[in-house]
């Protein structure tokens, strides 16, 4: 019998973001629900055909979502938040939960969207389920069953995928005090029984049930709940229990006791778990080996994976399945849409469509197909060639990396000395006012950027247009009487992509989009070689802006860890090494900025916290190199050069030591929505440097009043000495318009001026 091959899921957005554009048309009222559903059906059909035509044993159904697969599960379970429930749920119900509903919408009262948060340690976001003690679950949303029928009628052998009951509960939150959401499990399991029975009646043989929390360090109460859950939901379908993103070493002894028929493990994230899993695998279970990495863009070394899995095949026989490591949701759709890439670079990559082919080819090779074995060897050759390419592994970069010592991470003076130098050089008032960096990306800016990229504007013409926007931003800030100005970042489409386009070692794509949430997609750059800065990146823009004003101009950089976390990294070197390469490049930029007369430089690190590994025991090692990378970037600054960093998190307690270890002169943080509660972590830690707690929620169109900002600043002054407080918005203002921005900043400046007298 042939080796069973499958993937855990396929991108839902379409090759050219067709779903994104259709959703946004629907939300604007430009197409109706029938047209939207027709487009969705076409995307699903294409995805299933890709899998079946490649030779996979199963086509995966249930991976399509109009907004988010966790939200789809919420509706499947009849668990719509009460504020959005309105009889039988439909697509509009789903969108209200994900996006919220304004007061004027549909003639009804407004209702807030459910929270959104990161899906484990990926850059995908899910809609957080909400739980109350009286919640009931009733299968009422037919999408899964309809899509299974679609696939069966189209002639595909279907494997539905379903988020498991324990992961669904774990990933949610209680919205009332005094109860534990785990107590809802018995009620939830009844709904899962109904789902599996329905799938069995449709002729389904195998169901993929995703329980990614089995890769975490679970509390005993959660780990112990699995045995009951999988006894109760047992039905006539076979269950493949699916884990990903890390090893199951902490939960394996619990897993092998479960009443299921197979286990999927992520061998890309954790290859070392294979031997232990095989040793403990129950005799009747299948083992799905996730060897094709679903989280990246790199071609799989099929020759190496064949050699690795061949003895497993000999031992397990037909019980060995071959699969992607996780859903291909996290990979761009199709490499064939990138004709501009060189043949060499293209030979290094595999996007979702190509990864499907990899899984199928490896399966045939394990079945002894000689042509497939030879094809695996040929396919893997570019990976071997790349290892010795000097334009990938650059001697000059390696030499700099080898020269990194502890002294390279240290500023030349401690904070107290630096603060005295900076006070003298900068001449700033009490409660200095500034912004986080970006100003509104107007329609004019976007039109001019597009014209430049399509050749309709020359480099000179584009630069002149950008200087016009910078001059306008400086003029507006001076009129507002802000103390520290920024140039506004008109030249940047994205805070990471801009640096990727200007550093050697990156590759950008045209259609390398992946879903972030809902209709929002991102196009991460790809680290393809050792990273170095060949010329200054931001100096021209910052110095031009400084030439227009006598006030201090802040240079703006994206930090090394954030660039790393928001790109596709290399697989052949460690993340630590990539971060160090980025840090050295940014260090040179810091030196050039200060030598050009820029006295304040901000190095944004919004992603340090989200880069944390899933297992807490791995946190310290990560935080050590992440902090060191930031410090390498900043340590070339002279004592009189003030280094800022910006972070936007909802929780600082677990990383406050590391935040302090960054030794930034000023940290600006997002606090307005928490009413300054986030400052408790800094107060308890006795954070020694300067802090700018955000007083303007830039995610909302609401304009904060002067009185509101004053109240927030007074709260902040109770937790942080006023001599160390800055006044600023929560985040950059790229997504706001100028009217909102100027009105809010006028109130911010007025509040700061008033409190300088009161709090002095």
From Swiss-Prot:
Family membership: Belongs to the vitamin-B12 independent methionine synthase family.
Q: What is this protein called?
A: 5-methyltetrahydropteroyltriglutamate--homocysteine methyltransferase
Function recorded in the entry: Catalyzes the transfer of a methyl group from 5-methyltetrahydrofolate to homocysteine resulting in methionine formation.
Chaperone: is it a keyword of this entry? Answer: no
Enzyme Commission number, as recorded: 2.1.1.14
Claim: DNA-binding is one of the keywords in the record: no
Q: Which reaction does it catalyse?
A: 5-methyltetrahydropteroyltri-L-glutamate + L-homocysteine = tetrahydropteroyltri-L-glutamate + L-methionine
**What are its GO biological-process terms?**
methionine biosynthetic process; methylation
Give the species: Vibrio campbellii (strain ATCC BAA-1116)
């Amino acid at each position: 019998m042939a080796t069973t091959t499958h993937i855990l899921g396929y991108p839902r957005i379409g090759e050219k973001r067709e779903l994104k554009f259709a959703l946004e048309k629907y939300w604007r009222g430009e197409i109706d629900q029938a047209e939207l559903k027709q487009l969705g059906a076409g995307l699903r059909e294409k995805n299933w055909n890709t899998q079946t035509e490649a030779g996979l044993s199963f086509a995966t159904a249930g991976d399509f979502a109009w907004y988010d697969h966790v939200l789809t599960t919420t509706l499947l379970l009849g668990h719509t938040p009460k504020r959005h429930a309105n009889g039988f749920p439909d697509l509009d119900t789903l969108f209200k939960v994900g996006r919220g509903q304004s007061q004027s919408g549909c003639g009804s009262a407004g209702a807030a969207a459910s929270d959104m948060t990161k899906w484990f340690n990926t850059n995908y976001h899910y809609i957080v389920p909400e739980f109350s003690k009286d919640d009931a679950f009733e299968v009422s949303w037919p999408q899964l069953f309809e899509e299974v029928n679609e696939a069966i009628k189209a002639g595909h052998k279907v494997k539905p995928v379903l988020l498991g009951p324990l992961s669904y509960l774990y990933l949610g939150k209680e919205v009332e005090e005094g109860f534990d959401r785990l107590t809802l499990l018995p009620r939830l399991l009844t709904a899962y029984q109904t789902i599996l029975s329905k799938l069995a009646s449709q002729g389904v043989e195998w169901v993929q049930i995703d329980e990614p929390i089995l890769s975490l360090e679970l509390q005993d109460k959660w780990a112990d709940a699995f045995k009951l859950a999988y006894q109760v939901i047992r039905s006539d379908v076979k269950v493949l229990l699916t884990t990903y993103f890390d090893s199951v070493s902490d939960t394996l002894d619990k897993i092998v006791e479960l009443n299921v028929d197979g286990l999927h493990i992520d061998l890309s994230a954790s290859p070392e778990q294979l031997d232990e899993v095989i040793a403990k695998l129950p005799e009747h279970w299948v083992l799905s080996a996730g060897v094709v990495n679903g989280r990246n863009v790199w071609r799989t070394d099929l020759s190496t994976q064949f050699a690795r899995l061949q003895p497993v095949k000999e031992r397990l026989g037909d019980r060995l399945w071959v699969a992607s490591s996780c859903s291909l949701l996290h990979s761009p759709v199709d490499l064939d849409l990138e004709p501009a890439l060189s043949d060499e670079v293209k030979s290094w990559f595999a996007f979702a469509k190509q990864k499907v082919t990899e899984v199928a080819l490896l399966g045939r090779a394990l079945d002894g197909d000689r042509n497939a074995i030879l094809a695996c060897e040929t396919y893997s050759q570019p990976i071997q060639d790349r290892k010795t390419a000097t334009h990938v592994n650059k001697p000059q970069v390696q030499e700099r990396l080898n020269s990194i010592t502890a002294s390279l991470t240290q500023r030349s003076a401690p904070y107290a000395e630096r603060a005295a130098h900076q006070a003298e050089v900068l001449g700033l008032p009490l409660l200095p006012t500034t912004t986080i960096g970006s100003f509104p990306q107007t329609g004019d800016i976007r039109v001019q950027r597009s014209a430049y990229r399509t050749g309709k504007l020359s480099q000179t013409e584009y630069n002149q247009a950008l200087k016009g926007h910078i001059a306008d931003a400086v003029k507006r800030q001076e009129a507002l009487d802000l103390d520290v100005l920024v140039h506004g970042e008109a030249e940047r489409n994205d805070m990471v992509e801009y640096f990727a386009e200007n550093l050697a070692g990156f590759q950008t794509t045209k259609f390398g989009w992946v879903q972030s949430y809902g209709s929002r997609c991102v196009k991460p750059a790809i680290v393809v070689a050792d990273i170095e800065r060949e010329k200054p990146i931001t100096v021209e823009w910052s110095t031009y802006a400084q030439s227009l004003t006598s006030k201090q101009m802040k240079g703006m950089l994206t930090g090394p860890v954030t660039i790393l976390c928001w790109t596709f990294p290399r697989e052949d070197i460690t993340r630590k090494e990539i971060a160090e390469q980025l840090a050295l490049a940014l260090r040179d930029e810091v030196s050039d900025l200060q030598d050009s007369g820029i006295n304040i430089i901000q190095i944004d690190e919004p992603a340090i916290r989200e880069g944390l590994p899933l297992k807490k025991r791995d946190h310290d090692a990560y935080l050590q190199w992440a902090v060191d990378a930031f410090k390498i970037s900043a340590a070339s600054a002279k004592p009189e050069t003030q280094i800022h960093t910006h972070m936007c998190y909802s929780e600082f307690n677990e990383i406050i030591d590391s935040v302090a270890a960054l030794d930034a002169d000023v940290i600006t943080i997002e606090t307005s929505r928490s009413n300054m509660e986030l400052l408790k972590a800094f107060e308890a830690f006795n954070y020694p440097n300067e802090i700018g707690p955000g007083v303007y929620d830039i995610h909302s169109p609401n304009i904060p009043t002067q009185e509101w900002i004053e109240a927030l600043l007074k709260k902040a002054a109770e937790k942080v000495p006023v001599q160390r407080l800055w006044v600023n918005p929560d985040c950059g203002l790229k997504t706001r318009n100028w009217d909102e921005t100027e009105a809010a900043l006028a109130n911010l400046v007025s509040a700061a001026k008033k409190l300088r007298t009161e709090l002095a």
